[in-house]
Structures are given as structure tokens and as C-alpha cells.
UniProtKB/Swiss-Prot annotation:
It catalyses: ATP + H2O + cellular proteinSide 1 = ADP + phosphate + cellular proteinSide 2. GO terms for cellular component: plasma membrane; type II protein secretion system complex. Belongs to the GSP E family. It comes from the Bacteria. ATP binds at G325, P326, T327, G328, S329, G330, K331, T332. Keywords: ATP-binding, Cell inner membrane, Cell membrane, Membrane, Nucleotide-binding, Protein transport, Translocase, Transport. Its EC number is 7.4.2.8. Changing L40D: Complete loss of interaction with XpsL. Its main location: membrane. This is Type II secretion system protein E. ATPase component of the type II secretion system required for the energy-dependent secretion of extracellular factors such as proteases and toxins from the periplasm. Acts as a molecular motor to provide the energy that is required for assembly of the pseudopilus and the extrusion of substrates generated in the cytoplasm. GO terms for biological process: protein secretion by the type II secretion system. It comes from Xanthomonas campestris pv. campestris (strain ATCC 33913 / DSM 3586 / NCPPB 528 / LMG 568 / P 25). It is found in: Cell inner membrane.
Length: 567
């Protein structure tokens, strides 16, 4: 009865904290009778509750400490005599791990602290009172392997049981059989799960002669993960291609696909791209978390002193507003946030995207399909006959698309789009280089926003220090803070943020078109002159915006320099 009571309280807490949906709970209860599993175990198995949410809620409801098993080394403390009575199979089955003895009590780290059967069994086997602490299931399983097993990680255990035969890769049926083996399925699932735990935006799976390299892009920086051996290359790549509904027999041409799945309670949309390389197909999976994305300018890092000016340009009834920056700089998220602000019942919004990354209620979103002739330009021609107020084009890729967008702006539509340029002034010169007439640009461009993403400091643990005279002079910090002592921040590694950074924030510069800039465009002024005139009119560069954030402890000067050196 006590176990059920604890489970009930934990489930109720998960619902209250919105870490579990009512519909998912109903679904799990329907399956519970058939499976014979406990409710919380089933919720985890179905991916309806993430490991972290499960552990944090258990710790909070039961009043137990939450621990990070990754902080412990690979060598266990001196083995307790009493622990010898606990089999490795028992530890794995119940996801618990003794880590030492404290004040006559056995320090037991456990994933399911409501499991009275397992806890009583440990107490009886060891004859010791227990000190319970809660950890994530996968982290405790890894710890068990490292300490009480053969020192293998979860991936290492899977790899040992997996079969791979490079010589059979020309046989499509053999390849399909390899990809359908349970160890290969678990291996691919583990890679995706690890990406979710790391908050990665992309997974890179790259075949080489001796191994299959796995890397994750976390906060814009690639981090290498555990790599399976090269013998599993064909099986792993084929498994991903099967999940993405791609042709596993075609290995000479690039392919694009999509995987929809649920991982740790999150609905994930993975965009899959494959390209042939010397040692096999390289795969990149972009992770889109539809449930946690928030279209809020403040949460993106836009400052209160900047937003009024940006919104004023955004709310103009017609014209063109561009967002520029390299791939992965957050342009699409900024445009989606702008659209969500403009999305009211009295406005019709139509977008053309490749691909449609997030779906927004009330907005007509068109997926471009160049392979059947539905490119940006052709879609735009049809859109203007749909009586829209606002049009969003995923990217101005060519002169034809740019000219139709400009014509739409001239006929009373507000057009939002993106360009790949390094700074805001570069947006004007890029359109001129495309062949757009200068008088059309001056008549339609309202503003150009350039942006980058910098890693955000884990401010609670960052090291604050007084800036040296050399730093103050080199970065001209007195221009931003004329008075008082100037402080900067350094990242400090923690279990939650191994690099000292946690998430990313935006740094921006916003060029607002005015009469002086229009005259400069008409006389074909260079990018440098256009930027000088924009700064004279009040534009703050991305570099300056980044320095301001560094002074506030949001990021570091090193991060700002890393992303703005070409701006």
C-alpha cells in the first residue's frame, strides 16, 4: 500500500508540474494491466516521462537528495563486504548501486526510491540501514557497469552484443536484417537519447576507417561522444535510414528524410540528411523539440532597450524586414517569434519554408518542394493571389525570389525573409550584387536585423573577476561603462554545465532604413560606408551588443569574439 501511495503522489506531482500529460497518463493506465509493470516504470518505458523529470520529482516528493552519478570516477571505493551479497543482475534489474558506507549506513543510489521490494531486499542482504539518494536511471546503470560490472558504458555493453559484417553491406536484405537487430536499435536510440540529455541541436554520425564517429552540437559547439566500432557503420546508418523512410539501397546519392519519435517524454522531430563519403554515408540529424520551443523575444536574448525599435519596424503595414546571419544563427526562430507576435485574427499570414520547422496555429505554412517545381519563386506567385497581409519567405535565394518579394512589398504586403550575410549592412550589398535595382531597395526595405548566437554562462556558478587595464583598453569597455569598477566573468564547470555554459542567447545589430541610408544606397555606397552611416544613426553592432552582455555576466568576451570575428 505504501509503494502505491508513493507512486500516486509522484504521478500527481508530475501532472501538477506539467511534466506528464493527462492523455498520456490515461494511455499508460490502459496498457498497465496488459504489461504487468508498475505505472511509473511504464511511463518511463513509453517515453512519456523523461528520466530527469522522474528523478527530480521522486526526490522532491519523497524528500531525498538528487545526485549525479557521472561525478563519480571509474574506480569504486573499497568494496564493502556486505555488498558482495548483491548480484550484478539484481543491481541492474532494480537500477540501484551501493556507493559506500556512511555513519554505519549503506549509501544507496537508486532510480526508483518508491520500490519497497528492492529496498527491503538490499536491507536484508546487507544487514545495514540505508541512506537513500535518487539518480537518473541511465546514469546509475552506467555506474553499475563501471564499478561492479566489467567497466563498460551502456554503449559499450550494446556494442559487445551487436553483430556487424561489413562484407554483407551489398546484400540489401542482410543489411535490413542487421539494422533490425535489437542491439543496433538500442544503440541508435541511445545516441538520440544522449543528444536530448545534452540539449544538442544536431547529431553527427561520421564513418571513418577504424570507427564510426558520433558528435553532438551543444550550444553551437561540437562535442565528441562515445564511438561505436567501424564494423557497425552499415547497420547503424541503415537503421537511421529505415527510421527516416529513406532508400537503404541508395548509397551513392544524398538523401533527406524525417523521423518523428518520443524520447524522454518529448515529441521530437528529427530532420535527417545523408551524404556519401569515402568510408560510407555520413548522417546529420537536426533535433527540433516542438514542445519546449518558446517564441518570446526576451527569452531569445533581445533586450528591453532594443525591442521597442524592432517592434516599430516589424509592425509597419508594408515593406520588407530581413534577418541575416550564417546557418545556425537563430534566424528562423527569430522569424517565427515575429510571426507569433503579428498573428492576430484580423491578419492573414502565409509562409513558404524549406522545411516547415514549427507549426503555428492560425498561419498558413507552405512546404517548398523544388523537385516538383514548387520553389520559393513559384510559391510566391500563387501566394499573392491568396490575399495575405503578411508573407514570410524562408530565404531569398535568388534574384527571381527577391524581385517577387519586392513586388509584393510594393503592392501593400509586409514581407519577412532571411539572407546569409555576416552583418546588417551586408544585406543591402548582397541584394545589389544579386541584381536588385537600388531604387527598389530604397522603396521597400524597412530594416535588416543581423544576429549570432553566443553561449550563455551558467551565471550561478560563473567566476566574477575585475577586468584588467589591458582588457578595458583592448575592448574599449569604458565606452560601455564609463564609471565604476568593471567586472567580467569566466565559465566554471559543473555537473549540469560541464563547459560552464548553459544554453545560448542572441546578440544583434539592427539597421533601420532612413533617408541618409537611402541616398547612400542610390549612389552605390560600399558596405563599410553603409555601416558607418547606420552607426551614426544609432545602430549598435553585434560586437557591442555582445560586450554589453559580457559585462552583465550573460556570456564571455571570448564567446563574443568567437562568433563576431567575421562580422
Amino acid at each position: 500500500m505504501e509503494q502505491r501511495s508513493a507512486e500516486t503522489r509522484i504521478v500527481e506531482a508530475l501532472l501538477e508540474r506539467r511534466r506528464l500529460k493527462d492523455t498520456d497518463l490515461v494511455r499508460a493506465r490502459q496498457l498497465q494491466a496488459e504489461s504487468g509493470m508498475g505505472l511509473l516504470a511504464l511511463l518511463g518505458r513509453l517515453g512519456l516521462v523523461s528520466e530527469r523529470d522522474h528523478a527530480e520529482t521522486c526526490a522532491e516528493v519523497l524528500g531525498l537528495p538528487l545526485v549525479d552519478a557521472r561525478q563519480l570516477g571509474d574506480t569504486p571505493p573499497e568494496m564493502l563486504p556486505e555488498v558482495q551479497g548483491l548480484s550484478l543482475r539484481f543491481l541492474k534489474q532494480f537500477h540501484l548501486c551501493p556507493v559506500g558506507e556512511r555513519d554505519g549506513r549503506l549509501d544507496l543510489w537508486i532510480a526508483d526510491p518508491y520500490d519497497d521490494y528492492a529496498i527491503d531486499a538490499v536491507r536484508l542482504a546487507t544487514g545495514l540501514p540505508l541512506l537513500l539518494q535518487v539518480g537518473l536511471r541511465s546514469e546509475i546503470d552506467d555506474l553499475i557497469e563501471r564499478w561492479y560490472g566489467q567497466g563498460r558504458s551502456a554503449m559499450g555493453t550494446i556494442v559487445e552484443t551487436a553483430d556487424g559484417d561489413a562484407s554483407s553491406t551489398d546484400d540489401i536484405e542482410a543489411l535490413r536484417d542487421l539494422a533490425s537487430e535489437a542491439p543496433v536499435i538500442r544503440l541508435v536510440n541511445l545516441v538520440i537519447q544522449h543528444a536530448v540529455e545534452l540539449r544538442a541541436s544536431d547529431i553527427h554520425i561520421e564513418p571513418f576507417e577504424s570507427r564510426l564517429k558520433v558528435r553532438y552540437r551543444v550550444d553551437g559547439v561540437l562535442v565528441e561522444g562515445e564511438s561505436p566500432p567501424a564494423k557497425l557503420t552499415a547497420a547503424v546508418i541503415s537503421r537511421i535510414k529505415i527510421m527516416a523512410k529513406l532508400n537503404i539501397a541508395e548509397r551513392r546519392l544524398p538523401q533527406d528524410g524525417r523521423i518523428m519519435l518520443r524520447v524522454q517524454g518529448k515529441e521530437l522531430d528529427l530532420r535527417v540528411s545523408t551524404v556519401p563519403t569515402a568510408h560510407g554515408e555520413s548522417v546529420v540529424m537536426r533535433l527540433l523539440d516542438r514542445e519546449t520551443v518558446v517564441f518570446d523575444f526576451y527569452k531569445l536574448g533581445f533586450t528591453e532597450d532594443f525591442l521597442p525599435q524592432f517592434r516599430k519596424v516589424l509592425e509597419q503595414p508594408h515593406g520588407i524586414m530581413l534577418v541575416t546571419g550564417p546557418t545556425g544563427s537563430g534566424k528562423t526562430t527569430t522569424l517565427y517569434t515575429a510571426l507569433s507576435q503579428l498573428n492576430t485574427s484580423d491578419v492573414k499570414i502565409i509562409t513558404v519554408e524549406d522545411p516547415v520547422e514549427y507549426q503555428i496555429e492560425g498561419i498558413n505554412q507552405i512546404q517548398a518542394k523544388p523537385q516538383i517545381g514548387l520553389d520559393f519563386a513559384n510559391a510566391l506567385r500563387s501566394i499573392v493571389r491568396q490575399d495575405p497581409d503578411i508573407i514570410m519567405i524562408g530565404e531569398m535565394r535568388d534574384l527571381e525570389t527577391a524581385r517577387i518579394a519586392i513586388q509584393s512589398a510594393l503592392t501593400g504586403h509586409l514581407v519577412l525573409s532571411t539572407l546569409h550575410t555576416n552583418n546588417a549592412a551586408g544585406g543591402i550589398t548582397r541584394l545589389l550584387d544579386m541584381g536588385v535595382e537600388d531604387y527598389l531597395l530604397t522603396s521597400t526595405i524597412n530594416g535588416i536585423l543581423a544576429q549570432r548566437l553566443v553561449r550563455k554562462l551558467d551565471l550561478a556558478n560563473a567566476e566574477r573577476y575585475a577586468a584588467s587595464p589591458e582588457e578595458i583598453e583592448r575592448f574599449d569597455l569604458r565606452r560601455l561603462q564609463p564609471d565604476g569598477e568593471i567586472f567580467l566573468y569566466r565559465p566554471r564547470a559543473t555537473a549540469a554545465a560541464p563547459t560552464g555554459y548553459l544554453g545560448r542567447t542572441t546578440i544583434v545589430e539592427f539597421l533601420v532604413m532612413n533617408d541618409e541610408l537611402r541616398r547612400a544606397v542610390m549612389r552605390r555606397a560600399g558596405m563599410g560606408e553603409i555601416e558607418q552611416l547606420a552607426r551614426k544613426s544609432g545602430m549598435r553592432t553585434m560586437y557591442e551588443d555582445g560586450l554589453s552582455k559580457a559585462l552583465r555576466g550573460e556570456t564571455t568576451i571570448e564567446e563574443v569574439l568567437r562568433v563576431t570575428e567575421d562580422a
